Amino acid sequence: MISPDAARNVVGIIGNVISFGLFLAPVPTFWRICKRKDVEEFKADPYLATLLNCMLWVFYGIPVVHPNSILVVTINGIGLLVEGTYLLIFFLYSPNKKRLRMCAVLGVELVFMLAVILGVLLGAHTHEKRSMIVGILCVFFGSIMYFSPLTIMGKVIKTKSVEYMPFFLSLVCFLNGVCWTAYALIRFDIYVTIPNGLGALFGAIQLILYACYYRTTPKKTKAAKDVEMPSVVVSGTGAAAAAGGGNTGGGSVSVTVER
């Protein structure tokens, strides 16, 4: 019979694979930006938010905060690299006004992270306290990001059209939330359960809306249409297996869907 730790590891690895896929979801958007050498109306906000989320989860997973959390560090370390690449591309092809704003927000995030790191390491002297403080921050920012799909869901209900809510992306986000929620429940971790439970819930609602309104969606009037989805949180615990506790991957992605 499979042990709880082994089951948690398997679920965590699956969650990491799904999370990695979601981190790569905006690639078509940035491919378009590189080809046109212009960010057009796209905003850096979702990627800046994801960057902060990843930084918090990486800090949560290091041994001095939450021991044995190698998967949380690896998936969010990858997330930092991916989001950093997106932001570099965005910076290169943005007008000066957008560049200055992006740098200002990034500066605030770095100062905030420095304050969190110093405050936690100097003010909390046990793994439990450090995990609690950083975990609460991760839950807070992750939960806020999970509410962003409410806008697109409201638009679906108002227009009775799922034109701006791609089925595949909704399905993957639902599976991501379910996977990490299941992981968190194998060995209960409140900091992973809350944001991912919300993710599973909102993902399920999007799928229900899709089932209700896909038949009433009007035919496309253009050969191709670009849609910028609200941010999608990539949050989970990778083999908390490792963390004898948890591993958590976090992030949000804005994706352009070409139809």
UniProtKB/Swiss-Prot annotation:
Q: Name one GO cellular component term.
A: plasma membrane
Q: Where are the transmembrane segments?
A: 10-30, 46-66, 70-90, 104-124, 132-152, 166-186, 190-210
UniProt keyword Lipoprotein present = no
Q: Which residues lie on this side of the membrane: Cytoplasmic?
A: 31-45, 91-103, 153-165, 211-259
Tell me where in this chain the MtN3/slv domain is found. 10-98, 133-216
Here the disulfide bonds are none
Q: What is its main location?
A: membrane
Record InterPro entries: SWEET, SWEET_rpt
* Ranges in the topological domain labelled Extracellular: 1-9, 67-69, 125-131, 187-189
Example GO BP: carbohydrate transport
Keywords from UniProt, A to Z, are: Cell membrane, Membrane, Repeat, Sugar transport, Transmembrane, Transmembrane helix, Transport
Q: Which GO terms describe its molecular function?
A: sugar transmembrane transporter activity
Q: Does the keyword Iron-sulfur apply?
A: no
Q: How does it sit in the membrane?
A: Multi-pass membrane protein
The protein's location, in the record's own words, is: Cell membrane
- Record's Pfam families? MtN3_slv (PF03083)
Among PANTHER family, the record links this protein to: RAG1-ACTIVATING PROTEIN 1, SUGAR TRANSPORTER SWEET1
Oligomeric and partner information: Forms homooligomers and/or heterooligomers.
Q: Record's family?
A: Belongs to the SWEET sugar transporter family.
- What this chain does, per the record? Mediates both low-affinity uptake and efflux of sugar across the plasma membrane.
Report the protein name in the record: Bidirectional sugar transporter SWEET6a
State the encoding gene.
Answer: SWEET6A
